[in-house]
């Protein structure tokens, strides 16, 4: 009798790991993008929570005037934020080991870079994971394409804008009031409200909300009755049923008569593509606009564009907006510079002519 002893193949462990990572039978799909997504998002989330609760003040402007952002240093949920890295750091990569001490790293806002860079890698991988799962299931890739809009927006405010401005201190703070401060300063310095790409983004977001509400209300109003008056209409739908749950002809007829015939879709597929494409394209344009304004190609300037026959300026809303911009810029970093850049660049006329 001969006994054959075969060495266990070490490749089996790797093959089992590959099958587990790419299996669509798992409760949560991991995927190869998920292998990188999970640790990066966990790192960003953990550091954000710790920094939001207890990070010391950060010298954001690089002028030895630290700004407090954490809860333990006097802030609340509304005013709290992870303060961006110091202007003294600029665009330098600033991991913990580049600082002389942990205190220096915290003082210069190192956690902001750690959170933002890990977060961006994580959301990029999440988008890739959406594509990967769609591929495994034989689906089309439009879920990942739609998700690319908020990914592009996050990349614009957290990475592209700081690169264009020359410092991570110009990035968006990670907090509620910090976000509003970022928006006001962005308007003051770049006149974003007068940029056509931002206007397309507003149309995309508000239009998408309107179309979503219209579609949902039309479907809900034209459900095919499958229940009695005493039962909930939701019980009339069975998951996976083949027949339609609402009457698209009735919805089409109603909407066509409410506005006009060709305002209503008669194809469910083209309708849902439109509902997805409208806000996505709008947010794409907004992200592109922020990326353009990052390099100071700003919104339109119509200040003092209308004058009467005597040469006197006839004020418009553009002039009102310009005055508001100057006021916001005066208040921004008021200890870092004395005047808004727009005023400082203007040649001062002498008070007395000789």
From Swiss-Prot:
Alphabetized GO MF terms: chlorophyll binding; electron transporter, transferring electrons within the cyclic electron transport pathway of photosynthesis activity; iron ion binding; oxidoreductase activity, acting on diphenols and related substances as donors, oxygen as acceptor; oxygen evolving activity
Binding site for a quinone: 215, 264-265
Keyword Repeat: no
Pfam families registered for this protein in UniProt: Photo_RC
Annotated residues for binding of [CaMn4O5] cluster: 170, 189, 332-333, 342, 344
Site (Cleavage): 344-345
UniProt site positions, description: Stabilizes free radical intermediate: 190
GO biological-process terms attached to the record: photosynthetic electron transport in photosystem II; response to herbicide
Transmembrane feature ranges: 29-46, 118-133, 142-156, 197-218, 274-288
Entry keywords, A to Z: Calcium, Chlorophyll, Chromophore, Electron transport, Herbicide resistance, Iron, Magnesium, Manganese, Membrane, Metal-binding, Oxidoreductase, Photosynthesis, Photosystem II, Thylakoid, Transmembrane, Transmembrane helix, Transport
Post-translational modification: Tyr-161 forms a radical intermediate that is referred to as redox-active TyrZ, YZ or Y-Z. C-terminally processed by CtpA; processing is essential to allow assembly of the oxygen-evolving complex and thus photosynthetic growth.
Family: Belongs to the reaction center PufL/M/PsbA/D family.
Quaternary context: PSII is composed of 1 copy each of membrane proteins PsbA, PsbB, PsbC, PsbD, PsbE, PsbF, PsbH, PsbI, PsbJ, PsbK, PsbL, PsbM, PsbT, PsbX, PsbY, PsbZ, Psb30/Ycf12, peripheral proteins PsbO, CyanoQ (PsbQ), PsbU, PsbV and a large number of cofactors. It forms dimeric complexes.
Additional comment: Cyanobacteria usually contain more than 2 copies of the psbA gene. 2 of the reaction center chlorophylls (ChlD1 and ChlD2) are entirely coordinated by water.
Stated name of the protein: Photosystem II protein D1 1
Organism encoding this protein: Synechococcus sp. (strain JA-3-3Ab)
This protein's encoding gene: psbA1
């Amino acid at each position: 009798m001969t006994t054959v002893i075969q060495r266990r193949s070490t490749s089996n462990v790797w093959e089992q790991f590959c099958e587990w990572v790419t299996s669509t039978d798992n409760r949560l799909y991991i995927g190869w993008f998920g292998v990188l997504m999970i640790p990066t998002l966990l790192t960003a989330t953990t550091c954000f929570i710790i920094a939001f609760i207890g990070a010391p003040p950060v010298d954001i402007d690089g002028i030895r005037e630290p700004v407090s952002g954490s809860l333990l240093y006097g802030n609340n949920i509304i005013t709290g934020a992870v303060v961006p890295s110091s202007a003294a750091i600029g665009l330098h990569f600033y991991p913990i080991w580049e600082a002389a001490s942990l205190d220096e790293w915290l003082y210069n806002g190192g956690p902001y870079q750690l959170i933002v860079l890990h977060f961006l890698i994580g959301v990029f991988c999440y988008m890739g994971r959406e594509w990967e799962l769609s591929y495994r299931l034989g689906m089309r890739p439009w879920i990942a394409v739609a998700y690319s809009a908020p990914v592009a927006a996050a990349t614009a405010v957290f990475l592209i804008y700081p690169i264009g401005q020359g410092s991570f201190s110009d990035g968006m703070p990670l907090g509620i009031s910090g976000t509003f401060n970022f928006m006001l300063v962005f308007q003051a310095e770049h006149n974003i409200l007068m940029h056509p790409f931002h206007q397309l983004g507003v149309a995309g977001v508000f239009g998408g909300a309107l179309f979503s509400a219209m579609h949902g209300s039309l479907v809900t109003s034209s459900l095919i009755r499958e229940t009695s008056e005493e039962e909930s209409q939701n019980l009339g739908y069975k998951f996976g049923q083949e027949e339609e749950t609402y009457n698209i002809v009735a919805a089409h007829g109603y909407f066509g008569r409410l506005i006009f015939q060709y305002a209503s879709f008669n194809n469910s597929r083209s309708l849902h593509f439109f509902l997805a494409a409208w806000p996505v394209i709008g947010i794409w344009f907004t992200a592109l606009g922020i990326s353009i304004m990052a390099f100071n190609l700003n919104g339109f300037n119509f200040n003092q564009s209308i004058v009467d026959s005597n040469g006197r300026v006839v004020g418009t809303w553009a002039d009102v907006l310009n005055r508001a911009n100057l006021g916001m810029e005066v208040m921004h970093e008021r200890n870092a510079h004395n005047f808004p850049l727009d005023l400082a660049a203007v040649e001062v006329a002498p008070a007395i002519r000789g």
